[in-house]
Amino acid sequence: MISMKADFNLKKINLDLSKELNLAGQIISKDHFTRLEKGQDVYGRQMADLEDATIEKKGFNQILVNSGKMRNLIVDKATKTKQEALVHPGEKQKYKNSKVTMSDVGGFHQRGSSNLPKREWFGISTEAETNILKMISQRIDREIRRA
């Protein structure tokens, strides 16, 4: 039988992960932009093509791209006192002459409807999640070793 005793001081562990959370927000945002440029959903699948009438109206054939707001996500940064980074297309900004926000429109596209195919464009891809978890795990391991 092997036994081991380890002492460490919990007060030495820095639980401020705001830097890592902000980096995670940037990883998600960059991954999101890259996927939409390729026309891929959050699972890496090709999204449903646009209808001919939509292409004619927009003047181009890029899914979920009009103003750029849906692909250029906003990252509300984490701080030492607020350990949360929020990533969204826009929760406050409304479309001109409307009460509808970018998040509202994003939800509509995410769910789809009878005349709009479901396009699961928003979320965290497996690749981004893996990279984020690895980064945060390494940081926590470093803090525990230093304690």
Report the location of each language-model feature.
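Short, Lys/Arg-rich flexible segments
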Residues: 1-147
